[in-house]
Amino acid sequence: KYLKTGFATPSGKVELYSETLEDLGFDPLPYYREAAGTNEEYPLRMFIGLPDDEYFRTGMRHVPELRKRVPDQTFFMSPNDAERLRIVDGQWTRLTTKVGSVFGRVFVRSSMPDGLVRVPHGWWKPESKKGLENMSGMWDFCDARITTDDDPELLDLEQGIPHMKGVPCSVEKISETEIARLEKAYGPTNELKRGPEGKVLRSDAKPNDFMFDEFTGDGIEFEAIELSLYGRNTI
């Protein structure tokens, strides 16, 4: 196709140096930007955008069997971070960024690196109250509530797309009063199902053979996409 039509660039070729970006006042070459730094108020970094393994984006939360496996929004966290924050597995917490906060239950996994929190995408509870005031739990659980929208340190300057990784955040335990409010609105807190710890493929162990699928044990390098594929492993 592209041998005949060329690419959708002024030259019709692959352009590593973009004259279009240059005309708009941006750097015409790819460049690296340091992630926004953490601080005392927001000592952790979160990444969002990946759904729970059991669901498809924002969908399928009405399926009883899937909700038995993952009944609530969960925050994936390393054992060291959980111990430092005095949070136990399955405990209700609040995750806060500079733009907002959501509730979720901590899911301690040895494959998570220290300092990083994974927040699954698109949480809501279709069985709960609807309407603008409640939005079926979206105001309490959805990652859209904590995604920055105007911080230049956390935006793709060329397109205005918010960063989904490396966003400074904090996680803290919530009070019994707050837990009671959540349970009144959304039902009792049920046990979080736990499957065996998923094994993650070391990036430095990958040979050129794309069929290679040998996995290693704990304490290995973390890669976000591999956590999405293998992290919870409840089946």
Where in this protein do the model-derived segments appear?
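Long, low-complexity segments enriched in small/aliphatic residues
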Residues: K1-E65, E214-F215
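Long, contiguous, secondary-structure-rich segments that constitute the structural scaffold
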Residues: H62-F76, N80-I235
